[in-house]
Amino acid sequence: MSYTPMSDLGQQGLFDITRTLLQQPDLASLSEALSQLVKRSALADSAGIVLWQAQSQRAQYYATRENGRPVEYEDETVLAHGPVRRILSRPDALHCNFHEFTETWPQLAASGLYPEFGHYCLLPLAAEGRIFGGCEFIRQEDRPWSEKEYDRLHTFTQIVGVVAEQIQNRVNNNVDYDLLCRERDNFRILVAITNAVLSRLDIDELVSEVAKEIHHYFNIDAISIVLRSHRKNKLNIYSTHYLDEHHPAHEQSEVDEAGTLTERVFKSKEMLLINLNERDPLAPYERMLFDTWGNQIQTLCLLPLMSGKTMLGVLKLAQCEEKVFTTANLKLLRQIAERVAIAVDNALAYQEIHRLKERLVDENLALTEQLNNVDSEFGEIIGRSEAMYNVLKQVEMVAQSDSTVLILGETGTGKELIARAIHNLSGRSGRRMVKMNCAAMPAGLLESDLFGHERGAFTGASAQRIGRFELADKSSLFLDEVGDMPLELQPKLLRVLQEQEFERLGSNKLIQTDVRLIAATNRDLKKMVADREFRNDLYYRLNVFPIQLPPLRERPEDIPLLVKAFTFKIARRMGRNIDSIPAETLRTLSSMEWPGNVRELENVVERAVLLTRGNVLQLSLPDITAVTPDTSPVATESAKEGEDEYQLIIRVLKETNGVVAGPKGAAQRLGLKRTTLLSRMKRLGIDKDALA
């Protein structure tokens, strides 16, 4: 049959019909408006729209009966295999009476969707050459439509096809928009909860944070994390109940695993969603929910916490409103459980690391105690000279306080031994002294090593690292070569000394620390302050109690003791049997300048032990000169005729106005090191201040 436009209505009539149908917001309204139009036009008593969903193979039906009753129905069986299926394969007008309809589609006729009628017509709904349903018209009298009436019905159908497609597109767009909004909101929730829980390394804090976030976003009032106990067949339960919105109740308990719903989830490793009744067989701690909410039916959702293939525990959610656990919410809760599992895994790992750390600390304390019992008060410090006696008296004086100590002295004078003695005599001796050489580490890594860093704080920071100040909490921190600390790092050290707090790199969280600082340097900090190479405020903080270590040349009476101690220690280490040291060897060694101090002396003795054959230490002069620089007074400023060393130094000091160091100082003019010149001045009884 060929169809032509409905010309007898005229353009205005066609426009009015189109406008009326286009104004309908949805398919049900469109069906109702269509029924009114065809009824007013005396074309039919009612009309309906049948849409075909190709993807789901379902049919949707919208109609308004003669009595005005709206009908909406959808299925994939009876309706989907009715007249709409025929029109999809044969896109021609389908018309029949009720008897023919009943014989062809008996199940549909018996469904009650179609009360008895006289005549039925279904015309295809098409858009862009694609049939997506049909538009049906029903007459109560058994009278077929004339050709002119079919023409009008077809015009109605064409308009309905355009409008129905627009409505479907609008609905689909709204659905897509709602879906995108829901996915966006879910993503925000997931990110917020992930950020909140992943930073928690304490199980109690983690559970509290998980509960707070889930309660906030899902209005769930009972949240628990259930973990297996180290005791067999036991469960540790960390629970939070929001009986009071502002004061949630936190509980921790250990229960038997047998017979619990949690046991079922541990075995199946699958989510469990269940409605509980008070009459159900429940574990005692599960029955507590009814004490909380009365005899209402409780809906429980138990989500497995998986780390790879390992089951860590169960996230247990309970609420007396079943609608909380919708399909969309369950999908999001599963994703949240995955993030919570990562946080639980991190927290358990942190617990284990903390336990091992505590054990190591205990073992270290025991070893420290043993070492303290073996060594004397001053450990390896050897010396009976007045200079060393004064140093050790200062050590005893300052050890019991928490004051910062600055140990000054040339390289090799034993600054670390003095620092260790101060620590061992202090109230902090129960913990290991932490030490660090500021000159032995690149400036870029020094801050991280001192204060620690968070994961991702800089390129290569793949894990959190604890700095020396944290390690030295309740103990002592020995900073050797503090004069080599970069200028830009000095304010941060000053802050720790003043406030006893600091921040790790990449973190804004303040960490409190209780550290006793012992610093050491072989540099002239006063001069560095004057040259703007060292902060004066940090210098004053460090210089609370300075201890000046004498160089070895200023305590020659200690050299024989040191030689003997080094000889026997090194010989024992090398498996040698040396029990005698010639007096001449001791006198020779005692007369040397030793610019490298005790360390240089120890190296010389070690070489002598290595070359000795027999049980008497053998040390020849070539051996000494090979390792000890010539310290004879070869000076840039030569002595005048009849002028001895004393007179030469006096004259040069007067010419330099008593200045010893620096490019215009006496040491430079004499070709000597500053320390060497000072040593000779002390030996000769020269006071530079009296000459200036």
From Swiss-Prot:
ATP binds at residues 409-416, 472-481. The keyword ATP-binding applies. PROSITE patterns: SIGMA54_INTERACT_1, SIGMA54_INTERACT_3, SIGMA54_INTERACT_4. InterPro entries: AAA+_ATPase, GAF, GAF-like_dom_sf, Homeodomain-like_sf, P-loop_NTPase, Sigma_54_int, Sigma_54_int_dom_ATP-bd_1, Sigma_54_int_dom_CS. Residues 202-344 form the GAF domain. Residues 663-682 bind DNA. It comes from Salmonella typhimurium (strain SL1344). Required for induction of expression of the formate dehydrogenase H and hydrogenase-3 structural genes. GO terms for molecular function: ATP binding; ATP hydrolysis activity; DNA binding. GO terms for biological process: phosphorelay signal transduction system; regulation of DNA-templated transcription. Residues 381-610 form the Sigma-54 factor interaction domain. This is Formate hydrogenlyase transcriptional activator. It holds the Pfam family GAF. It comes from the Bacteria. The keyword Repeat does not apply. Disulfide bonds: none annotated. Keywords: Activator, ATP-binding, DNA-binding, Nucleotide-binding, Transcription, Transcription regulation, Two-component regulatory system.
